[in-house]
Amino acid sequence: PGVVNFVPGNPRMIVDPCLENPDFAGVHFTGSTRVFQGLWGKIAESLPRLRSYPRIVGETGGKDFIVAHHDCDRRGLLIALLRGSFEYQGQKCSAASRAYIPESVWEGIKGEFVEEIQKITMGDPRDFTNFVTAVIDQKAFDKISGYIRAAEEDPLCDVVVGGGCDDSKGWFI
């Protein structure tokens, strides 16, 4: 009923009722590329019933990056790196999967960054003192641990902290 509505949930339960409304004016979707492609198709099929062409925006299959300037707020950068990389185990579309940081800035925060990572608690998601828990499934575990192994084997990369992966009791990275 409003001008802008945030509607999280099962896409199958949301999309059809929205597209049945002739006033449907647009969607900003965040999720998988495959689901977004299906959504495009459904919208195209609905065009004859709609009063106007809806605006369609999709953020699919990507993750964010962090760019730091040489005179950035270093504490703010440190927090952005930590939260962007580790909240929700890095499994969200806004997760920071890479960072572009001047060497002079990196050398100034590297030690504190490592210290802060070592303070992060990991374990059972039912224990709310844990900041990080297991990744979603075996496929995600295999993919992420593969990236870590590739970094460890690449002579141009330095893994400065962590790198361990354990799937004996959940998919922990």
Each model region followed by its residue ranges:
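PLP-dependent aminotransferase-like
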Residues: 1-15, 47
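ALDH superfamily catalytic-core signature
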Residues: 20-22, 26, 32-173
